[in-house]
């Protein structure tokens, strides 16, 4: 059984990577971070990913997972918000294999964080339907059913009251609109009640920086489904990418 995998998390400002102990979900050694190139074209970002695995000295045969701030359908990105638009319709599996010299497993960054929370974090040992949401500028999401990830769910783009849910209920909008915790909680109530109605989940896990202040908003929500804060936070993307790559290589 594979004991070690590599996770690479591509973000708008930085490309981060680390080797992960698959038994514990912890980093082996230090994380590498290289600023995201500008412009963040596919070739430029792939070159940085190569630098990351070279600095980590990732051996041939070690699974590599790479996260993107976009959906990834069968290795192809249909649209891109946070990197260069030249990523649209790129076969990222083929691109990364060309630059890294080996196959990778590509996935959405929220999917990676969600599967990490189920494998090693707040939802470890929990069965049933787990809905993970990450709060930030928008709302990322992952749905895991009895340990199996349903990819590219994009629950932040559910239409609620005539607009994308994340345009009302993200923590980014809380900051932008100067909402207090009670005002924001009213919007969260509308959003999570809708998700609860659609999916009837067994557990909500909420990530993103705002989850560190969970005691200020979670008690204000009235949901049938239990809600808990994420545990892994800054390591979740890399850990989830590594775990998912090991499961799917």
What is the meaning of each model-derived region?
Residues 1-63, 72-79, 92-104, 116-131, ...:
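ATP-binding/phosphotransfer module of carbohydrate and carboxylate kinases, centering on a glycine-rich
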């Amino acid at each position: 059984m594979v004991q070690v995998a590599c996770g690479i998390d591509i973000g708008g400002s930085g490309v981060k990577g680390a080797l992960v102990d698959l038994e514990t979900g912890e980093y082996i050694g230090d994380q590498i971070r290289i600023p995201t190139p500008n412009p963040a074209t596919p070739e430029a970002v792939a070159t940085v990913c190569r630098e990351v695995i070279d600095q980590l000295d990732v051996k041939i045969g070690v699974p590599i997972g790479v996260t993107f701030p976009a959906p990834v359908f069968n290795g192809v990105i249909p649209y891109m918000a946070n990197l260069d638009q030249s990523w649209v319709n790129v076969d990222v599996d083929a691109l990364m294999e060309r630059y890294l010299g080996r196959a990778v497993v590509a996935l959405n960054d929220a999917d990676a964080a969600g599967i990490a929370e189920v494998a090693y974090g707040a939802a470890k040992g929990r069965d049933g339907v787990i809905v993970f949401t990450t709060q930030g500028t928008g709302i990322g999401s992952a749905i895991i059913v009895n340990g199996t990830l349903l990819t590219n769910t994009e629950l932040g783009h559910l239409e609620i009251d005539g607009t994308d849910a994340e345009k009302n209920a993200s923590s980014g909008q809380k900051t932008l609109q100067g909402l207090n915790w009670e005002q924001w909680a009213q919007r969260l109530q509308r959003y999570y009640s809708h998700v609860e109605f659609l999916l009837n989940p067994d557990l909500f896990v909420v990530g993103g920086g705002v989850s560190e202040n969970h005691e200020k908003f979670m008690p204000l929500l009235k949901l049938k489904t239990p809600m808990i804060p994420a545990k892994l936070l800054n390591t979740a993307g890399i850990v989830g990418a590594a775990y998912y790559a090991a499961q799917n290589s």
